Amino acid sequence: MAVVEQALAFKDPEGHRVSGILAFPPSHTDRVAILCHGFLSNKNSTTNKVLSTLLLERGIATFRFDFFGQGESEGPFEQITVSLAVKEALAALNFVASKGYRRIGLVGSSFGGLVALLAASEWPALSCLALKCPVPDFPEMLELEFGQHGMAEWKTTGTIPDVTGGPGRVKLQYGFYEDCARHLGYDAAKVITAPTLIVQGDRDEYVPLHQSRRLYDALQSEKRLEILAGADHRFSRPEDLRRMTTILADWMVQHLPAERPEPGRVDDAGASTPA
């Protein structure tokens, strides 16, 4: 299958350059899934790349981008906030819509899951939403992960442990935590109209399972909760990664149904259009 990837960039509402990659199949489509990566990750995360391949094979374009201060996007990571990340997700939605995509799905992983959830609550035209181990209560997760002493150290030093497993500490303003407290996902879930999927492993070592269950209960739209036995936060085992990405892809395909296939070409805007 001939897949085209195009490096693109757009500006967030505060003027920062956001780096992204638009990938589309050879046939015309107005369907696209926007992929939001996790904390201290980037647009080329394993989940994003595997999921992009699965969706492209089924005729759905993908757009993956880097949040502020991560990957190739502008900004010092230490100044990232949930508020800014949501603005960037909404800007990404506007960006793909400007490229001619009309049926748009949104996928978010962990931190990106919270961001996608909040963005979906402000984008009623969204066709579907898929969340991989989302963190609707980020403050709770941070408090559990760092403990009282770690939270105090963060406030004093402006650094946190490297949650990706590195030996050092990462610069991050304490204002990130304070901003998180203003952006819990449960209330946002109540106004989302798009069909919503939640996938999490029952051995997630970071995000408490009760958050996904409470989030599921708060959703008023069509919804589905998948708890995968034995899977950790990163879906480290190949079989867990395969199952998780397949479930996400199937949800997108179900709620972004295919039009009659036709040969296509790539126009200057980046979307696939009929020849």
Predicted regions and their residues:
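N-terminal cap/lid segment of alpha/beta-hydrolase-fold proteins
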Residues: 1-28
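The serine-hydrolase catalytic nucleophile loop
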Residues: 40-52, 67, 210
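Short alpha-helix in the alpha/beta-hydrolase fold that links the catalytic acid
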Residues: 48, 185, 194, 208-217
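Conserved alpha/beta-hydrolase
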Residues: 52-74
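Catalytic nucleophile-loop/oxyanion-hole region of alpha/beta-hydrolase
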Residues: 71-101
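Hydrolase active-site cap/lid region
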Residues: 124-175
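Short beta-strand/loop motif that positions the catalytic acidic residue
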Residues: 191-193, 198-200, 204
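Catalytic active-site module of serine/aspartate enzymes centered on a nucleophile-bearing elbow/loop
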Residues: 231-275
